[in-house]
UniProtKB/Swiss-Prot annotation:
It is found in: Cytoplasm, Cytosol. Belongs to the NDRG family. The lineage of its organism: Eukaryota, Metazoa, Chordata, Craniata, Vertebrata. GO terms for biological process: cardiac muscle cell proliferation; cell differentiation; cell migration involved in heart development; embryonic heart tube development; heart looping; negative regulation of platelet-derived growth factor receptor signaling pathway; negative regulation of smooth muscle cell migration; negative regulation of smooth muscle cell proliferation. Transmembrane segments: none annotated. Residues 330-352 have a biased composition (Polar residues). This is Protein NDRG4. It comes from the Eukaryota. It comes from Homo sapiens. Expressed predominantly in brain and heart (at protein level). In the brain, detected in astrocytes. Isoform 1 and isoform 2 are only expressed in brain. Isoform 3 is expressed in both heart and brain. Up-regulated in glioblastoma multiforme cells. Contributes to the maintenance of intracerebral BDNF levels within the normal range, which is necessary for the preservation of spatial learning and the resistance to neuronal cell death caused by ischemic stress. May enhance growth factor-induced ERK1 and ERK2 phosphorylation, including that induced by PDGF and FGF. May attenuate NGF-promoted ELK1 phosphorylation in a microtubule-dependent manner. Keywords: Cytoplasm, Phosphoprotein. The gene is NDRG4. One of its GO terms (cellular component) is plasma membrane. Residues 314-352 are annotated as: Disordered.
Length: 352
């Protein structure tokens, strides 16, 4: 890979072109951070607030960042021709190795939201050697049943597409209050994203199958995500039940579950500081970023109490200093005990 690919790229894949935006340049053998947005959004609408947050920029200067836009969802995308077959969720996942290979990434740390979280989870199931870790926000591992499908169809007949998508993105409380954030996203979804292309993506997401994952030991030959995973959901978010179920199907020794208070349906937008702090400790658990510096204190690394608990519950790293030379860390997978509590419960509710 050249020293810097900073900017926009259209990558050929077996299922069509993918629009990709690269920020930064490769840092030794460290993985790339690869993002995938939710349906109704693109990488800008989904991730700009999070990645522009000052503390997050302190993290990303240690990594190259690769933002992936689902086909036809980027700003200024041309409308697909009549009869175009939008890729299935499995095919969207199968497009990503072309991106990884094009830029010469050895492996990635994925950050996905909603539909993007589903795509990245499917990617990690099919190509586990390419994925170092996953942050999955608002993931629903379940396919749509007939009742859900009928409800979605009915909603599409009685609501505009942006309003239908908003009910997927935001909590009922946020929608009822018609918050400034909801109003802003209603306008941007209607004006920035090509509506015909969005309809195709929306239809395909609502035709998805179950992820087909099970916690190891619960069924014979159980399939699950092999990499460290951080699950994130806001309180009262539409995806809350799905994320809870996903947590029950993953390996508890390599999974952290963050339920974030006061964050609604888009925690990466409403609470970028909390999510950034959690992401720092997630990276530390995998052996990246040797120390954290709290900019508010001259003394340096003094994390909040809730994040200290999170760090204890994360998979312990044997080689956190390896981030200095960029070599791939090897994390042990035992869980630690908290004082007087016995086995740590990996479900961690952040309410700071």
């Amino acid at each position: 890979m050249p020293e810097c690919w900073d900017g926009e790229h259209d990558i050929e894949t077996p299922y069509g072109l993918l629009h990709v935006v690269i920020r930064g340049s490769p840092k030794g053998n460290r993985p790339a951070i690869l993002t995938y947005h939710d349906v109704g959004l693109n990488h800008k609408l989904c991730f700009n607030t999070f990645f522009n947050f000052e503390d997050m920029q302190e993290i990303t200067k240690h990594f190259v960042v690769c933002h992936v836009d689902a086909p036809g969802q980027q700003v200024g995308a041309s409308q697909f021709p009549q009869g175009y077959q939008f890729p299935s969720m499995e095919q969207l996942a199968a497009m990503l190795p072309s991106v990884v290979q094009h830029f010469g990434f050895k492996y990635v740390i994925g950050i996905g939201v909603g539909a993007g979280a589903y795509v990245l989870a499917k990617f990690a199931l099919i190509f586990p050697d390419l994925v170092e870790g996953l942050v999955l926000v608002n993931i629903d591992p379940n396919g749509k049943g007939w009742i859900d499908w009928a409800a979605t169809k009915l909603s599409g007949l009685t609501s505009t597409l942006p309003d239908t998508v908003l009910s997927h993105l935001f909590s009922q409380e946020e929608l009822v209050n018609n918050t400034e954030l909801v109003q802003s996203y209603r306008q941007q979804i209607g004006n920035v994203v090509n509506q015909a292309n969005l309809q195709l993506f929306w239809n395909m997401y609502n035709s998805r199958r179950d992820l087909d994952i099970n916690r190891p030991g619960t069924v014979p030959n159980a399939k699950t995500l092999r990499c460290p995973v951080m699950l994130v959901v806001g309180d009262n978010a539409p995806a809350e039940d799905g994320v809870v179920e996903c947590n029950s199907k993953l390996d508890p020794t390599t999974t952290t579950f963050l339920k974030m208070a006061d964050s609604g349906g888009l925690p990466q937008v409403t609470q970028p500081g909390k999510l950034t702090e959690a992401f720092k400790y997630f990276l530390q658990g995998m052996g990246y970023i040797a120390y954290l510096k709290d900019r508010r204190l001259s003394g340096g690394a003094v994390p909040s109490a809730s994040m200290t608990r999170l760090a204890r519950s994360r998979t312990a790293s044997l080689t956190s200093a390896s981030s200095v030379d960029g070599s791939r860390p090897q994390a042990c997978t035992h869980s630690e005990s908290s004082e007087g509590l016995g086995q740590v419960n990996h479900t961690m509710e952040v309410s700071c």
